[in-house]
């Protein structure tokens, strides 16, 4: 394992697989994300406007660099149907060396 800085995993939920794929393809094509994992059929329970809601969503794990956070946020907001899309950043502290090198090689310089 290699200690790394400035890499992150972003979590974002979307209402359906089509929207998740649209966002994922755009982020990878634009080299803002090295990889996006899609978890279909996740159940989200949350409060919205005073009501407890339960929805089936698609969770995206977006693997990227911290420096792209604002650009990724802009793209998600542009392509996402929710008024308030969830975008949460988790810092990556270490990674398999070869995976890190691959990620670094496919992302924008």
Feature map (PLM): residue ranges:
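Positively charged, small/polar-rich N-terminal and surface patches that mediate targeting and assembly
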Residues: 1-109
């Amino acid at each position: 394992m290699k200690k790394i800085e400035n890499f992150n995993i972003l979590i974002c939920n979307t209402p359906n697989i089509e929207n998740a794929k649209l966002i994922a393809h755009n982020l990878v094509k634009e080299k803002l994300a090295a990889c996006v994992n899609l978890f279909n059929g996740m159940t989200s329970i949350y409060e919205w406007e005073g009501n407890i809601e339960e929805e089936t969503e698609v969770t995206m794990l977006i693997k990227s660099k911290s420096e792209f956070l604002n650009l990724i946020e802009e793209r998600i907001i542009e392509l996402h149907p929710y008024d308030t899309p969830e975008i949460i950043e988790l810092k990556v502290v270490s990674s398999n060396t070869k995976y890190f090198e691959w990620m670094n090689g496919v992302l924008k310089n």
